[in-house]
């Protein structure tokens, strides 16, 4: 069946325009807010306020959706899912190595909490990479 669509989402509508810098600034701001809201949610949990944590998590997810729209507007992803997954797979592999190096540095400096988290998140990046590779192997042969 042929689709006769007249209105769709488009990737990269602000790329190369005078709005590109504003969209990029908003993308970066929204990403930062996601991390801050999630950190605040963790603090709320530590303070025994789980319902506050859930509200903050919800706000973080809405901010992440905003970031996603800004990423689409500036063409930070392509219109080809396989290419996007391959791009992210490379990034996860790089993050795996960089976080492990940061863990080693933190250990040398005697900053155990930083070492522990960098080491753990390095393994998370490896897990993410394996998941993305699995998707590529199964769906994009």
From Swiss-Prot:
Residues spanning the membrane: none
Q: Can you name one GO molecular function term for this protein?
A: oxidoreductase activity
Keywords of the record = Iron, Metal-binding
Record's superkingdom?
Answer: Archaea
Query: Which SUPFAM superfamilies has this protein been placed in?
Result: Ferritin-like
In this protein, which residues make up the domain named Ferritin-like diiron? 13-141
Which InterPro entries does the entry link to?
Anaerobic_Peroxidase-Rel, Ferritin-like, Ferritin-like_diiron, Ferritin-like_SF, RevRr_diiron-bd_dom, Rr_diiron-bd_dom
Listed binding positions for Fe cation are 63, 66, 125, 128
Keyword Transit peptide in record: no
This protein's record includes keyword Transmembrane: no
What protein name does the entry list? Uncharacterized protein MJ0746
């Amino acid at each position: 069946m042929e689709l006769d669509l007249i209105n769709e989402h488009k990737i990269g509508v602000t790329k190369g325009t005078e709005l590109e810098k504003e969209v990029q600034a908003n993308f970066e701001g929204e990403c930062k807010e996601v991390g801050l809201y999630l950190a605040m949610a963790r603090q709320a949990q530590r303070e025994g306020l789980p319902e506050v944590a859930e509200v903050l998590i919800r706000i973080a997810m809405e901010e992440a959706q905003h970031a996603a729209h800004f990423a689409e507007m500036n063409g930070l992803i392509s219109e080809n899912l396989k290419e996007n997954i391959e791009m992210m797979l490379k990034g996860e592999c790089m993050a795996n190595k960089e976080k492990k190096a940061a863990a080693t540095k933190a250990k040398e400096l005697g900053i155990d909490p930083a070492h522990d988290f960098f080491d753990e998140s390095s393994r998370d990046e490896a897990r993410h990479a394996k998941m993305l590779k699995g998707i590529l192997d199964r769906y994009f042969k």
